[in-house]
Amino acid sequence: MKLSVNLFTTLDGVSQAPGTPEEDTRGGFTRGGWLMPLFDEGSGRAVNDWFSHTSALLLGRWTYDTFAGHWPEVTDPDDRVAAQINNGPKYVVTSSPVGETWASTTTVLGEDFLARVQHLKSLPGGELQVHGSIRLAQALHRAGVVDIYRFLLAPVVVGGGSGLFGTDGPALTMRSAASTVTENGLIALELTPGEFRGASATVGGRQRHH
């Protein structure tokens, strides 16, 4: 399986609490709910396409509990996202037991989750997908194990909050595999990581790379 990270994000790189102001107030974040006023049919199509590649979900505990509090109530058999989240295999990175809601489809990964993720990647299938789970996504990004990055980029600046990229991650040059613009100006991006390429300059007859 390939490992993909799938996130809603703002222009200033924030992925915290896209749905509602109360969704995630950690760190004193008060500007949640920034995505929903702009979420349109094109956004829904993009998310449905993300889930069309899913073989299993890899979630942090916060996101797992948030999903468990919402998605079991969505019972429309034609809802691809709900069907995958409710019925598909889920791996959650946590040090404590999970509830009974999805007990039959959930496997708990402990502190050695990076080794377990590498094992899961070696298995046949589509994608092992991370949704939300910012701290988990950060750890996977820093470890250099992400194969695909997908973003639904909202034309919003919130001025603070948690996001995927920090100053301690690898330098990458991304290759665009797909991009679409929705009716409300959101951009759905699919990117694959590659070796960082900096600009070059000729100094004293020698080419220097930055």
What are these regions (language model features)?
Residues M1-I148, P155-H210:
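Portal/gating segments that form or line small-molecule/metal binding sites
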